[in-house]
């Protein structure tokens, strides 16, 4: 774990931040930030044809490294005593598992679901609208976390993310920084 924390501090905000590590951590401690987390490592791409939202055995799931990565994500928030109001997760098992291993407490939110697959791509506009409305109604006092998918983060923030990457924004979705946890 100590080695992972050293790697974290070497890599944190290396490319995607206009702020130093201390400034970003201070910003998170102030609250009022939206934290997008792409689910941890789940080998493969998309989901199998027999995908069933209610059956994790039909989905692409976290591997052991993804589970460890999820726990590491949680340790970042614990180590720096960053307060979280709520953790919201996509209903996909890999997102739920990321949220569970990182933060224990979470609730699912269908607006965070993937629309990568042709079966779900028609949901994009409705989901993004719902997510933006949710953010607009949020009081913005404490930090909130969204554990979701590449396509949702890309649609919301116009950036690409790696597995387990943490992207921090303000309420207006201005990117403050990102943490690559690989």
Residue ranges and their predicted role:
Residues 14-22:
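Boundary at the C-terminal end of the N-terminal hydrophobic targeting segment
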Residues 21-119, 159-182:
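Active-site-proximal alpha-helix that buttresses catalytic centers in soluble enzyme cores
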Residues 120-128:
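Short, surface-exposed amphipathic charged segments that create phosphate/polyanion-binding patches used
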Residues 4-13:
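Sec-dependent N-terminal signal peptides
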Residues 80-82, 138-142:
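Glycine-rich phosphate-binding loop signature in dinucleotide/nucleotide-binding domains
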Residues 32-34, 140-148:
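Generic beta-sheet signal
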Residues 127-138:
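A short, acidic, amphipathic alpha-helical segment used as a generic capping/interface helix at domain edges
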């Amino acid at each position: 774990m100590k080695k992972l924390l050293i790697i974290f501090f070497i890599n944190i905000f290396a490319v995607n931040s206009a702020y130093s590590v201390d400034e970003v951590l201070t910003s998170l401690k102030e609250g009022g930030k939206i934290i997008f987390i792409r689910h941890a490592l789940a080998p493969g791409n998309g989901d199998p044809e027999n995908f069933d939202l209610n059956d994790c055995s039909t989905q692409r799931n976290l591997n052991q490294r993804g589970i460890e990565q999820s726990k590491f994500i949680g340790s970042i928030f614990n180590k720096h005593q960053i307060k979280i109001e709520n953790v919201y997760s996509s209903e996909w098992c890999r997102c739920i598992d990321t949220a569970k291993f990182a933060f224990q407490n979470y609730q699912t939110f269908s607006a965070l679901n993937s629309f990568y697959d042709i079966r779900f791509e028609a949901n994009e506009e409705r989901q993004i609208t719902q997510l933006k409305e949710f953010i607009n109604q949020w009081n913005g006092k404490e930090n909130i976390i969204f554990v979701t998918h590449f396509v949702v983060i890309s649609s919301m923030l116009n950036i690409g993310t790696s597995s387990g990457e943490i992207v921090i924004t303000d309420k207006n979705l201005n990117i403050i920084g990102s943490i690559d946890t690989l």
